[in-house]
UniProtKB/Swiss-Prot annotation:
Binding sites annotated in the UniProt record for Zn(2+): C386, C389, C406, C411
Protein name, per record: DNA ligase
Keyword Membrane: no
Job description of the protein: DNA ligase that catalyzes the formation of phosphodiester linkages between 5'-phosphoryl and 3'-hydroxyl groups in double-stranded DNA using NAD as a coenzyme and as the energy source for the reaction. It is essential for DNA replication and repair of damaged DNA.
Cofactor: Mg(2+); Mn(2+)
Primary gene name: ligA
Residues annotated as the enzyme's active site: K104 (n6-amp-lysine intermediate)
Protein species of origin: Ruminiclostridium cellulolyticum (strain ATCC 35319 / DSM 5812 / JCM 6584 / H10)
Keywords on record: DNA damage, DNA repair, DNA replication, Ligase, Magnesium, Manganese, Metal-binding, NAD, Zinc
InterPro entries named in the record: BRCT_dom, BRCT_dom_sf, DisA/LigA_HHH, DNA_ligase, DNAligase_adenylation, DNAligase_N, Hlx-hairpin-Hlx_DNA-bd_motif, NA-bd_OB-fold
SUPFAM superfamilies: BRCT domain (SSF52113), DNA ligase/mRNA capping enzyme, catalytic domain (SSF56091), Nucleic acid-binding proteins (SSF50249), RuvA domain 2-like (SSF47781)
Gene3D superfamilies in alphabetical order: 5' to 3' exonuclease, C-terminal subdomain (1.10.150.20), BRCT domain (3.40.50.10190), DNA ligase/mRNA capping enzyme (3.30.470.30), Helix hairpin bin (1.10.287.610), Nucleic acid-binding proteins (2.40.50.140)
NCBIfam families (alphabetical): dnlj, PRK07956.1
Amino acid sequence: MADKIQLMKDKIEILDRAAKAYYQENTEIMSNIEYDKLYDELLELEKETGVVLSNSPSIHVGYELLSNLPKERHEKPMLSLDKTKDVGTLKEWLGTQKGILSWKLDGLTIVLTYQDGHLVKAVTRGTGEEGEVITNNARVFRNLPVTIAYKGTLILRGEAIIRYSDFIKINNEIADVGVKYKNPRNLCSGSVRQLNNKVTSERNVYFFGFSLVKADNVELDNSRASQMNWLKNQGFDIVDFKEVTSSNIEETVQWFSQNIEANDFPSDGLVLTFEDIAYGESLGSTAKFPRDSIAFKWRDEIKETTLLNIEWSPSRTGLINPIAIFEPVELEGTTVSRASIHNISIMEGLELGIGDTIGVYKANMIIPQISENLTRSGMAPIPEECPVCKGKTEIKQENGVKTLYCVNNECLAKQIKSFTHFVGRDAMNMEGLSEATLEKLIAKGLIKELADLFHIEKYKNEILELEGLGEKSFNKLITSINKARKTTAVRLLYSLGIPNVGLSNAKLICRYFKYDWNKIENAEFSELIQIGGIGDIMAESFIRFFSDEKKKVIVQDVLNELELEEVQLSQSEQIFENLNFVITGSVEQFKNRDELKDVIEEKGGKVTGAVTSKTNYLINNDNMSNSSKNKKAKELNISIITEAQFLEWLNNGVRPE
């Protein structure tokens, strides 16, 4: 008995560390399948011994919150759901009742409160007893109504999620994410719990309602389906659901399973709830689970295979990720041959060695993972040098998680941002080269400097092996790269990523030197500060860049691949030279404000984002607007002109008074 209780304590300690890492620190020290296995083993021991320890995860819902967001206790505790992987259990649980079967979205659960038709509060699930107030962040969710027709007090629950497509895009673009966000759920958690909701708004968070908690004086016929449809009519997106009975639940589960891969949103199973609200509520709850709902987790398809290699993939943060390469197997209809191991702690826990027989599966039927190591031959060697720069590596340990890092600050993998910037839309415009793809190309040693990007066609076979790139995508990429060979001095200058030299300043510099690249790269400090809009700091940064011998070689290698367009520019065309403009409000004669900005810059002017004492004109079609820019312009006695006045100036030379 004592041995079994000690075993329970050991399992609880491991589960507690894993849950803390996942929910508080947005990292993983074990896979979901390992966690579930340990948890089920603990439940069996508790059942066998009749002992449940006070710190067991079987009776605890969450963890203490560790952020600076305001906290608030929930009016009703938010319990987790009991779960099963057996459809027969679902059928038995439902019995003769009708039910609602819906997606179990894998994001962050949120409680929303509306009063008088307005969103007044949004709180995360948190510990289940207490959550974090994220009202300002919820206001910038992509699809959340901040005003609704219903004027009573409304409380509903739902899931904030980030779609797979946005996850891939955002994870490639956001520098501070690095390897921290392993999946859409972790990215969503970090996005929803921001102190600055500008960050939240840029992350494309969506909300899907799944439960109505309170709606005063609304008659919904004691029906969950009616509740969901009523929420939909109020403007909320709700989780897809189907009404089921014990006779059709098996085929309905099958329908959901067949539609997983078509979904752009993360899901980790299904939720079955009694359609009869009163009946469900009459059942009450256990200390941890409500009795009116149950979760269904997909039974993972596990295939045995042989571990062939562990590939170490460096990232822009210096972190070097271990990736398992194994004999290809068919999983959920696709061929899989690699899976992320995430960190050294997981690698040690699995005792992975080359040649081991391992079990692999797709987490949530999407992401390849290692479930177990059947032979456990011992740890494969951890590299002492970075695979990209051959510099020294070191193992770091934080919150009980071991990770491998390259300590060389000059490592090419850490310069990923310069490559990302170089291929960007306003620079070389090489469509198809995402940050993730560039990171893989660098990690494999296929590109070592910017000019190498123009010759990646010779690595076709290696590139086609990268996830997400097929023959068609590769051909489009090569076409885009070849198209980029013919470019402008402005694009080239901007693409070099010189500190403090943005696109508009690159245009000013190129225009000043008549687009002559030889004059541009050999510009003197005294010349640069003569250009309106170029100050001492920017000029110093420019001179420092072109004085660096290594940078000169990089630029020359790029130039050897390019054909710079000649620009013929007459002085008479520069009608906006040395003038500063600000654009606000909607435009009517141009496609958008960017098109208007381009016209101004082509004619020698500069467009800024804020009204200051240096602003000459504010372009605004609504002169009576109460916008901050309008007010500021009037305070500073700056001319406010309409598009029509601007066009009269542009086309007929009539400058507004």
